[in-house]
């Protein structure tokens, strides 16, 4: 199982997202659990990022919402950002 850490920015983005759309909490929780069990599950559309976000990865929570993360080891990741496609990929 994948071990998760969260960057402070991720936590504030998550809180902001849940405050605006409380119904997303359950969906996010389910996708994170799925990711922890099998990051390669095709339902996640997990993929490496390029250009300025090279060495980072992302998976889909909904059609628009992504979780951006980085691998810290073979079975450890740090969540960096969560939000709409335009928000998490703007950096």
Where are these regions (language model features)?
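PIN-domain endoribonuclease scaffold, especially VapC-family toxins
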Residues: 25-33
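A generic structural signal for short beta-strands and their flanking turns/coil linkers
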Residues: 31, 45, 55, 63-65, ...
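Enriched for short, Lys/Arg-rich terminal
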Residues: 3, 12-26, 59-66, 70-91
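Conserved N-terminal entry element of GNAT/NAT acetyltransferase domains
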Residues: 1-7
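Residues that form or immediately flank small-molecule/cofactor binding pockets and catalytic motifs
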Residues: 9, 54, 84
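A short, surface-exposed loop/turn module that caps and links secondary-structure elements
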Residues: 34-59
